[in-house]
Curated annotation (Swiss-Prot):
Record's function text: Plays a role in angiogenesis and cell migration. In smooth muscle cell migration, may act through the RhoA pathway.
CDD domains tied to this protein: WD40
Domain of life of the organism encoding this protein: Eukaryota
Principal place of residence: membrane
Name used for this protein in its record: Angio-associated migratory cell protein
PANTHER family: ANGIO-ASSOCIATED MIGRATORY CELL PROTEIN, MITOCHONDRIAL DIVISION PROTEIN 1-RELATED
Organism the protein comes from: Homo sapiens
Gene from which this protein is expressed: AAMP
Amino acid sequence: MESESESGAAADTPPLETLSFHGDEEIIEVVELDPGPPDPDDLAQEMEDVDFEEEEEEEGNEEGWVLEPQEGVVGSMEGPDDSEVTFALHSASVFCVSLDPKTNTLAVTGGEDDKAFVWRLSDGELLFECAGHKDSVTCAGFSHDSTLVATGDMSGLLKVWQVDTKEEVWSFEAGDLEWMEWHPRAPVLLAGTADGNTWMWKVPNGDCKTFQGPNCPATCGRVLPDGKRAVVGYEDGTIRIWDLKQGSPIHVLKGTEGHQGPLTCVAANQDGSLILTGSVDCQAKLVSATTGKVVGVFRPETVASQPSLGEGEESESNSVESLGFCSVMPLAAVGYLDGTLAIYDLATQTLRHQCQHQSGIVQLLWEAGTAVVYTCSLDGIVRLWDARTGRLLTDYRGHTAEILDFALSKDASLVVTTSGDHKAKVFCVQRPDR
């Protein structure tokens, strides 16, 4: 099956009020860039100094890991399949995937079957099951040094496992889980819950700190690259930038500064000076992490809007599903539920390209050190786009249902996907331009 024709808008497309500014601010002048990344040892030491509250130890689930038979690994499937390895031990939709950051040789996946597995990318061999969850596993990830792996289910049960020993070392029950992320430099786990709290734990001793938001779910969050702050988005449209050591908000954006609907995603640029936030209100806001001011608002192009409807008809919903910054050019990408991938030029404050998919975008990721952006969508296809030209470089197929999550190896040689077809797949990325 040949890929459908998908085009990007020409670079000379005039700006169609895709970006609005507050007052006389300009992006380049508002933001003061940090001199460079902090020393990892200093960050780890700072996290040691954080005043955590002592939590009462709860009885953990003592179930051990279970070794599954190798027949769960599938080499190929009927129909076009570009993948090298298919992991097939899940018995329901696979919601999440993460790669170990140190070696990029292991994956952890979690699914609707209440299971999470750690397995090897090269051949799909199961290393161990993260047993004991009683609800869909929606979050999973490795610590910064790949020694620990955390899994979280919808009910709020979080578990952490020592990778080399395959043993559970920590467990905690929070409220209904919205998101989870490891600290970039220390064995510290953060999570947002439906009661509006953001939690931070030292692992494995369990020392805990909470950051209380508004009385609504903390729908998305991200630790900033300096490791000292986190940005959290909430269901009521507010955005908070937290000081992790002090436990207090540095900036709060609400009302017209915030969003007019629940936040769906947040991202930060490489030095943490700029933040992008996305919402079901179809807007992506560019925020200075230093001043807490909104310096730009990106809105969907008119091409993506729905035609006028007759009486009694409802318009199709659209929302920002994923976004991110390019690491080598002043570009940002925003992916929408209606299938639009918009590439914005931050230097000229204009829409650079608009790339249309046949179905909704689920997630996008920028390749490190290049201007290539990857998208996965509800049609089960991974696509690679050149953000400089808006051109589709290639695509990868093999799933028989929507892709729900994907991860990219550091050297961009592997893409690992999870899907509603109960499978996780490993694709080898081959590009003649590198």
